[in-house]
Each structure stands twice: as C-alpha cells, then as structure tokens.
C-alpha cells in the first residue's frame, strides 16, 4: 500500500477527476464517503450528485477562510498481487483506517475506486477544514503517511514488493513503477485541480 498526497484549492477539479469526468474515460466506482449527502441508484449503489458534493465541500471549507488550499487528494494504490482479495469492503476499510490515523476522521471525504490500470487503486478527496472549522494538521504528513501505510500493510496482510531504501519509506517497488495510463491519469488530475487557480498558461 502506498499513498501520493497532493493539496489544492479546487474541489470541483478534484471531484470531477475522481468521478471520471476529466481526461480519458475511466471505469470508476464510488465506494465510500463521510459527511456529504449521497444519492443511490435503483440497485442501492452510491450515485453521487457531483454539484451537490462540490457545494458541500466548499461550504465546509468556508468555515475557515484562512485555509487557502482546503483540498486534500490521496491517491492510494496496492501491489498487483493484492487485487484478487482487495474487495471494495477491504479497500474501504484500509482507506478509512489510513484517514483516521492521518487525522481525517472528523471531516468530509469521498472514496472513488478506479479500475483503469493494472494496479488496484482508489482516490480520496478530503476536506482539510474539519467539521469544527479547524485546519487538519499536515505537519510531516508524508513521513507519517509512509509509516501508516507500512503499519496497515502489515496489519491487513497486504503484499510488499522489493525494498530500495529507508528514505523511500519501504514502499513497494512494483507499485512505484506506474504504467503509462496511470501516469496520464495523474497528470489529468493535477491539471484539472490547477486550472481554477491559474490566470495564464505560464501560471499553469
């Protein structure tokens, strides 16, 4: 299990990317959420209303206008060998545990599973302004994230790849070797999140 963390100011860009509306068409599924209104389809599956979710995230962010970048995006992936046992339930359990230990259990978040690459992974949009209007502590978040990933990987029996160095936080080598399509998805997401903040091509 490994996590890439990015920060931004556009909930719209992040949510639309995760829900498959930006970049190359993707197969995705909403598998979990917290603190936001959710619609359901006739089969009882999550059927999020995108604009309602965006409005909800933005409304909570306004509780603390000092936080200029309230969008936290977590791209969470696992070793390909875990795919056979990584059901939506197991993935959601691991993600919720990760968010709790990172301090994001008292805020809004949306968990979306993407099925367009060879490594099982999901994306999480979370509000850096919690339910009480406080900014969630992000001090040394990447170091803490790596430690938490290692703990959850061990506790839940996920697969480790070959290790390189302690500096790389013992993240599986196989999971670092992103496929071409995975890299395209990440670029599309980052561009989508940056567009609302850019005033010119140079800024972008």
For each predicted feature, which ranges?
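N-terminal nicking endonuclease/strand-transfer module with a His-rich metal-binding environment
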Residues: 1-204
């Amino acid at each position: 299990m490994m996590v890439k963390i990015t920060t931004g100011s556009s909930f719209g860009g992040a949510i639309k990317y995760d829900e498959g509306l930006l970049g190359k068409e993707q197969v995705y599924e909403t598998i979990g959420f917290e603190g936001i209104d959710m619609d359901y389809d006739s089969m009882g599956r999550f059927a999020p209303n995108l604009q309602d979710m965006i409005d909800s995230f933005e409304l909570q962010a306004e509780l603390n206008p000092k936080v200029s970048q309230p969008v936290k995006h977590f791209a969470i992936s696992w070793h390909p060998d875990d795919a056979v046992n990584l059901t939506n339930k197991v993935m959601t359990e691991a993600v919720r545990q990760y968010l709790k230990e990172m301090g994001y259990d008292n805020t809004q978040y949306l968990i979306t599973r993407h099925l367009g690459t060879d490594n099982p992974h999901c994306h999480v949009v979370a509000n850096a302004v919690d339910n009480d209007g406080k900014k969630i502590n992000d001090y040394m978040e990447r170091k803490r994230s790596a430690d938490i990933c290692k703990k959850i990987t061990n506790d839940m029996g996920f697969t480790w790849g070959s290790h390189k160095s302690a500096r790389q936080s013992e993240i599986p080598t196989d999971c670092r070797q992103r496929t071409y399509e995975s890299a395209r998805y990440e670029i599309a997401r980052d561009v989508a999140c940056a567009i609302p903040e850019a005033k010119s091509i140079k800024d972008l």
